[in-house]
């Protein structure tokens, strides 16, 4: 449960920041007047809506292994976010496309991640209630700690260091997904 929560904290850090704190900071440091923070929020969200619909329509019909799916989507969501942040100064349209792809892969795994506890062996309603209570509490505590630390890094070490911290902090998600049990057997 704690591993699941810690991983979720890293996921939330990547997931919430481009919708709240990050766009304004990126706009201040992009050196590109074409970059608009509201379009970063919009493109991540639109990609996310499409990703959620994709996941709901496609993944529930397929019997696939969860860990490889979550790892691949985790790498892609972080990779596309990193590319979007790299291109924001030189090619704003490409950065918006990258943010949208990040949103797609971010949100398309969300239903799979949140349903994983239901697929664990010997799971019952009492265990699920306790697990999700701990999961949400620790997940958001980790996110809050990362967000606070990110703001300190931004204020004391600068923009580039804060972006590196943001991406590295998000990697905790992938690291902890590697420790999850696989709930679907290999065919």
Please report, for each region that a protein language model flagged, where it lies by residue:
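A late C-terminal transmembrane helix in Major Facilitator Superfamily
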Residues: 106-107, 118-158
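Hydrophobic alpha-helix/TM-entry signal in multi-pass membrane transporters
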Residues: 1-5, 70, 95, 132
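Alpha-helical transmembrane segments of multi-pass secondary-active solute transporters
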Residues: 37, 68-69, 131, 161-166
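Multi-pass alpha-helical transporter architecture, strongest
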Residues: 159-187
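Intracellular helix-loop hinge segments at the cytoplasmic ends of transmembrane helices
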Residues: 24, 111-122
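Extracytoplasmic gate region of multi-pass secondary transporters
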Residues: 1-56, 110, 147
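Helix-to-loop junctions at the C-terminal end of transmembrane segments
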Residues: 51-65, 154
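C-terminal transmembrane helical hairpin of 12-TM major facilitator-type secondary transporters
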Residues: 64-116
């Amino acid at each position: 449960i704690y591993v699941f929560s810690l991983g979720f904290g890293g996921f939330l850090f990547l997931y919430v920041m481009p919708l709240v704190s990050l766009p304004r900071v990126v706009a201040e440091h992009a050196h590109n007047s074409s970059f608009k923070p509201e379009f970063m929020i919009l493109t991540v969200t639109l990609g996310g809506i499409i990703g959620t619909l994709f996941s709901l329509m496609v993944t529930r019909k397929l019997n696939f292994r969860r860990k490889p799916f979550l790892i691949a989507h985790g790498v892609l969501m972080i990779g596309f976010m990193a590319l979007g942040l790299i291109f924001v100064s030189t090619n704003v349209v490409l950065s918006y496309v990258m943010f949208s792809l990040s949103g797609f892969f971010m949100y398309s795994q969300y239903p799979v991640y949140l349903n994983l506890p239901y697929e664990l062996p010997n799971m019952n309603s009492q265990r699920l209630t306790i697990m999700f209570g701990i999961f949400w509490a620790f997940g958001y505590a980790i996110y809050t700690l990362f967000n606070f630390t990110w703001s300190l890094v931004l204020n004391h070490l600068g923009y580039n260091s804060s972006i590196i911290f943001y991406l590295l902090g998000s990697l905790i998600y992938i690291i902890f997904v590697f420790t999850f049990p696989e709930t679907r057997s290999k065919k």
